[in-house]
Amino acid sequence: MFFGEFEHALDAKGRLIIPAKFRELLGTSFVITRGMDGCIFGYPAERWATLQAQLDDLPLTRKDARAFVRFFYAAAAECELDKQGRVMIPATLRQYAKLEKQCVIVGVSDRFEIWGAEHWQQFETETAANFDDLAENLIDF
């Protein structure tokens, strides 16, 4: 399970260090793609295969399903970590998530997310202001 928040710098070549505890869960190959809220989603290969099967079950006749699947898959990239534990983030994904120098890598259960630090701070501030209401409407601790 992915959890925690880690800040790392994106280097000049577009490489980002993935936290050691996440590397253990990712194995040799994983997939990154466009995520919700302007971040990048990252999935271990096994979870990606499950998600792929779910997306394959969406009805081709629905315009919104076609648009979502097309947009989601178009930016997907199969990745491997280098010897320093870095992943190369493709330019299209860096642009989509507005990644600059500082990035935040966040664990979210079965996936991880990559955010630009400024965008993450904005999301965190907005969400913190509504956290009690979100919890009340979604889950009983």
UniProtKB/Swiss-Prot annotation:
InterPro entries: MraZ, MraZ_C, MraZ_dom, MraZ_N, MraZ_sf, SpoVT-AbrB_dom, SpoVT-AbrB_sf. Residues 5-47, 76-119 form the SpoVT-AbrB domain. PROSITE patterns: SPOVT_ABRB (PS51740). It is found in: Cytoplasm, Nucleoid. One of its GO terms (molecular function) is DNA-binding transcription factor activity. Gene3D superfamilies: Transcriptional regulator MraZ domain (3.40.1550.20). The keyword Transferase does not apply. Transmembrane segments: none annotated. The keyword Cytoplasm applies. Belongs to the MraZ family. Forms oligomers. This is Transcriptional regulator MraZ.
